[in-house]
Amino acid sequence: MEILQFIGYGNMAQAILEGAHEILSKRFILEITGRNPEKIAPFLQEKNIQAQIVPYKDAIDIHQKFVFLLFKPYNLKDFNYQGQAKSVLSALAGVGFKALSDAIDSLHYLKCMPNIASKFALSSTAVCEKSPMPLISQKALSVIESFGNCVRVGHEELVDASVATNGSALAFLSLVANSLKDAGIREGLNARGSLELVKMSFKGFAKLLEKERPEMIIEQICTPKGATIEGLSVLEKKGVRGAFIEACHKSVKKMRL
């Protein structure tokens, strides 16, 4: 059985392991390593995840393994890598294929941008490959698909750009959810009830978005001289649409520095 090695044990690694370990453990032997990989032991025990913790000594043995990089981008050169990997899957924001190949020897490279919805196998993940190899590519992509859906893009820079739509976007949507909850409280709902209503609204919206374009959803809800169009006019006047676009742009720009 192939080995899938996670280098890194932070929030993203934990989200992916939580959402995908049952599928991945049927296809791979799971390893976790990094500077202090023992830190993830309580999490593995709590979630009943079968993975081998490999202490870091002088170098990380990557030979003939599928290697998933899930640490901070600036730590790429902090490790020594021994051998040639079959595939390097990188979730390192702003790190291109050249930097990856300079640091780690591998037959295949894949850049991806997952998000923390991976813990429910609901990540929407942009991916781009360097020199695709049919059998290796298939297995590497199956790793990504184990924690959500996989959207291929034609250039590595577009993976970084996807932080606007599926990376930072979840934090921005959390701000929206919190604002709607507080709006409900302002109008007289208690905090618990308001949050429950917002949760279901998001679930319903997600279903609508599967079938409808955003502008069509707006059109179906708004009525002439109605309450919703009155509220939307305030949001447009305050520049909310432009603020979201600019916030996403700033996030992508920051990542590319």
UniProtKB/Swiss-Prot annotation:
Record-linked SUPFAM superfamilies: 6-phosphogluconate dehydrogenase C-terminal domain-like, NAD(P)-binding Rossmann-fold domains
GO CC term (a single one): cytoplasm
Cross-referenced PROSITE patterns: P5CR
Example GO molecular function: pyrroline-5-carboxylate reductase activity
Superkingdom per UniProt: Bacteria
GO annotation, biological process: L-proline biosynthetic process
Catalytic activity, as annotated: L-proline + NADP(+) = (S)-1-pyrroline-5-carboxylate + NADPH + 2 H(+); L-proline + NAD(+) = (S)-1-pyrroline-5-carboxylate + NADH + 2 H(+)
Keyword terms of this UniProt record: Amino-acid biosynthesis, Cytoplasm, NADP, Oxidoreductase, Proline biosynthesis
Family matches, as InterPro entries: 6-PGluconate_DH-like_C_sf, NAD(P)-bd_dom_sf, P5C_Rdtase_cat_N, P5CR-like_CS, P5CR_dimer, Pyrroline-COOH_reductase
Major localisation: cytoplasm
Enzyme class (EC, first level): oxidoreductase
Pathway the protein takes part in: Amino-acid biosynthesis; L-proline biosynthesis; L-proline from L-glutamate 5-semialdehyde: step 1/1
Known EC number: 1.5.1.2
Localisation per UniProt entry: Cytoplasm
Matching Pfam families: F420_oxidored, P5CR_dimer
Function: Catalyzes the reduction of 1-pyrroline-5-carboxylate (PCA) to L-proline.
HAMAP family: P5C_reductase
PANTHER family registered for this protein in UniProt: PYRROLINE-5-CARBOXYLATE REDUCTASE (PTHR11645), PYRROLINE-5-CARBOXYLATE REDUCTASE 3 (PTHR11645:SF0)
Family the UniProt entry places it in: Belongs to the pyrroline-5-carboxylate reductase family.
Name of the protein described by the UniProt record: Pyrroline-5-carboxylate reductase
Gene: proC
